[in-house]
Amino acid sequence: MNYVVDISDPSASDGSVTGGKGSNLAKLVRIVGKENVPHAIMVTTEFAKALLNNEKILESVGELDNKLTEGDEKTAEKIAAELTEEIENMRVPKELSKPLIAKVNSMKQHARRRRVAVRSSGVTEDLPTAAFAGQFETYLNVPLDSNVTKYVLKCIASAYGWRVVDYRNDLRKKQLLDISEADLVKKGVMSVIIQAMIDSDRAGVAFSIDPDTGNRNVGVIQAVHGLGEMIVQGKENAPWTAFVKRPEPRVLGTIVPSNPQKEMLIFDSKTGKNVEVPVKADNPKVLTSDEAKQVAEFTTRIEKAYDKPMDIEFAVENGKVHIVQARPETVHGTKAVLTLHKLKEQPRIRPTHTGIAVGTKIAVGPVVKALDHVEAKRQVETQNRKGIRPILVTSMTTPDWEVVMDLEKISGIICERGNRTSHAAIVSRERGVPCAVSVSNALRLEDEIKVTLDCSSGEARIYSRVLQFEVQEVELKELPETITKILVNIGSPNEALKVSQLPSKGSSLVRIEFIVAGTGMHPVFALKADKLGHDRWADDMKQKYSGIRSLSQEYVERLKTGISIIASAFLPRDIIVRFSDFKTNEYSGLPGALHYEIVCSCGKSISLSKQDRCPTCGSKKVECNEIELEFVENNPMLGFRGASRYVSRLFAEAFNLELKAFTEVHKLSLTNAIPMVPFVRTTDEADKVTNMIRKCFEESNLKIPRIIFMAEVPSICITPRKFAEYCDGFSIGSNDLTQLTLAIDRDSEILAWEFDESNPAVKKAIEMLCEGAHSMRPVRSVGICGQAPSDLGKDFIKFLVIHLDSIGVNPDKVVETLLVVKEIEDELRDFIEECDKDSVKISRELAISEANADYLMRKLFDTS
């Protein structure tokens, strides 16, 4: 009988022998190589089976089963506590202790620090439907010369901790687990892993899919400086690195939190304990590019071997990546329905708090605050007795909190601390509880005030009142195909990871303004700061842009990261990415749009705030000049924006940063990202801006991409063939086209009643554009990405189907629009056949030009 086996033993990869965690660890040796997995021995389930095979234990377990079946949780909890204590204090028979001690002694040649981690590995752990996140016990930094057997008993006993028993019982109620407590004992209930400790410089977790949306194209890595416990505890914010797996693993980029990690966890050899110390490394991204790539490669390899989405833990020591755990991702692996939560109206109030969204749901409820799990349970039960499911607010959670972290008891949870992989995030995600972490000052929310927790848009937002929302469920099955492409409008990378799973043919509009704002800098300011050099930056800049030596490089990197995440999320479908379309009043709000030049005898320096001395030499004999990069315009809507800005000497160099980011995206083989130029007024602008785009791609030895023009200015609609010489297609911006056709300021409240995208003049402009674009050879595509298709009814959609190649709508309208368009196309096909496919008759009946009638026939019947 094998009571203890080596990690490389063939039986170690059998879950019935070494439990969920243990078997996965053994499989990793074959997948990533033994040099990348810390050595371990495993106390098998046969050990636990033999240990627990006594009359008193078996009788108690049988009684536990009975009380759970009866619903007598109070007595069941008492029995579980007695079982835990009994097992922890058991005497281990010699036939069990002897092989254990021998194997522990053999570990000394592998654990050069003479310390091990003793981890529980339950036979029901790491199932495809349940994670048991952090519920079993783990003991770190256990000296090999100590009584390791004591920790083995503690791990086995943790199988009867109440939170574990309660969780197993909950899974049985949901029919996700069909084994009784008594049968678990017969199977051995628990294996124990004894693994060499890694004193990591950096550590983290990786998911082979996006853990919040289930997007399978994009994987996510989160890492912290020091030991990995810090990331699970959620005490510090962690950057997240996105990677794409196919055709080969490629790192897309890293998004750094606004308040990067300040404290790290290390092992103190003097005290024998882990202690927190300040982070000294000047790398807010934590992992080097090579390390991130290796983690991405390992994660991809592990997912392929398991043939399912995976969640792994890793540690980096002296530049070497070690994989320490792997388990199936339990939330999205078997999902058959995509659930979309959406506020019914845009809030007219600002959120009182923001943070990191976990999942994509919305919750409403009264606030209850608690700092420990005992108080949380009391508060939640008080509300439950009133028939209320509150929103629980705390600093952070641990496994003890799980008795209340259930949708039957709470509507949502808000934590001041944590990250996407902390305990609260993992459990909330698995149980479908709306959750926000890293919410500053959340505990200042008033007790019992009703709030709305909105996680639907990629960022967690908390509003201090009840907002109405709706839930749309989309079955992930085949929907009807349409000839007119249904596309979706996107605002941010996080939103794209969710929305890309809708049945669209791609994205009609990716607004990069969200990404630009997230860079935290005006691009012209970034270029100016780089020309002066990092040494000439004032302290306020060095603090704001900590760890960054070049602002323009950082600007490009952040744009590249955001765009590439969106492009990867939609692969292989195209996304149309609009270059930044901020107006002057919006650009003026970016950091650096207002800055200061400090002129000193030693040279010029630069600052975000007024200075009374030279930041470089300290001299007080300085001249501090206020610099404004943007100017005030009476009507920014008609001002310095779009193509006019890009080709201007005032902004051309900054526009080249956007182009550089675009080429970096294409270098990642993400050629499905198609550039779009907004607000093109004249053919002269069209010529200049397309030359800039082509030149940048040619200099990067890349294929010149398709180029799309926004059709917003009537000049494009009046002379479409002239503009078509410079682009490959058009996308109608219905808001601006209506504004400029009807001469109505789209922001005017007084004239709002006259603002109508279906006005005959606007429709005529669209008809002219389509006739010209479709007469070109090769044909220029025409789509729409404005607000109109999402807001107007079936008649306007029919007009668009007749004339356009694609229709872009907001995410909540994708399925509805797809079904309406399919119905319209079928009706039009029948109508055209009734007209004997006579373009003159079709033109007359539909009141459209013969050219547009010919296009409609070609489109619906695929004729040449």
Spans of model-derived segments:
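N-terminal beta-alpha lobe that positions the nucleotide/phosphoryl donor
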Residues: 1-193, 202, 283, 287-290, ...
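Conserved phosphate/anionic-ligand binding catalytic regions in large, soluble enzymes, centered on
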Residues: 16-50, 116-148, 197-240, 310-333, ...
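A structural-propensity feature for long, helix-poor, extended segments
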Residues: 41-94, 251-260, 266-268, 439-467, ...
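Terminal amphipathic helices with adjacent charged low-complexity linkers/tails
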Residues: 41-64, 266-267, 271-273, 304-347, ...
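Acidic, glycine-rich flexible loop/linker segments
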Residues: 54-58, 324-338, 352-510, 514-531
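Conserved alpha/beta-domain cores
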Residues: 111-112, 122-132, 201, 299, ...
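ATP-dependent carboxylate/acyl-activation modules
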Residues: 126-128, 138, 151, 157-162, ...
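Conserved catalytic alpha/beta cores of large enzymes that bind or transform nucleotide phosphates
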Residues: 179, 219-311, 315-318, 533-538, ...
